[in-house]
Amino acid sequence: GVQTCALPISVVDMRYENPHYMAEDAGAADLIAGGRLQLGISRGSPEQVIDGWRYFGYRPEDGQDDAEMGRRHAEIFLELLRGIGFAKPNPHPMFPNPPGLLRLEPHAEGLRSRIWWGAGSNATAEWAARLGMNLQSSTLKDDETGEAFHIQQAAQIRTYRAAWREAGHAREPRVSVSRSIFPLVSDLDHAYFGNSGERGDQIGLIDANTRAIFGRTYAAEPDLLVEQLRQDEAIAAADTLLLTVPNQLGVDYNAHVLEAILTHVAPALGWR
């Protein structure tokens, strides 16, 4: 029911965020949601404008680029979520203060362990593991070896898990991957996605220096779809699968797609 359903949000571009404001907002949202917030953050994606974060008052430190600025904002945000006091109290406050240094309020206990980092490379997946963030790996990543997308993504997940173990965190990490999956069970499915499954991974440039590999769309009759998904190494390596849906096709059609996956695909693969 609604009481146990997670409230996932992803991904927030940290280049544009004030970590202190964001810690307040995230804490409030998690408390309102009863501790169900699963918050995805990242360094952001290619944009419509040049250096849009500058208009929000942010700039990288000397020698840093905007990606490093986004990661710095994330590190500050994570530190604030620990709820450890850092600000000196006013000796003559308007309202009585608790003893010691003050933290940001509202503080949501446990939210720190429900932050996910959207990693586009193996290096940032390792960095996220060291900081104790869960891993969110999408339908694209940096093309680091020239291998198939799912193989590179599975390697990224292994790299992340190894870094997590090395960091000595007490809890087990969460790992999600995203996929576009369409069981072809109706004429409409065939009309929309009948040819999509024949295309493989795509290669493209997401900025001047970054060659990326984009994962294929899975679209086939249910039996074939199950066989194809069984061979996806990254799905096997993750504990959570996020489904990307074509929002522009409307609520009813997307509900049909999800229902078809739950009925025709998930049981055969042991998904729940």
Where do the language-model regions lie?
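Active-site mouth loops of central-metabolism enzymes
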Residues: 10-20, 109-119, 212-223
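C-terminal amphipathic alpha-helical "assembly" element
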Residues: 38, 137-154, 158-272
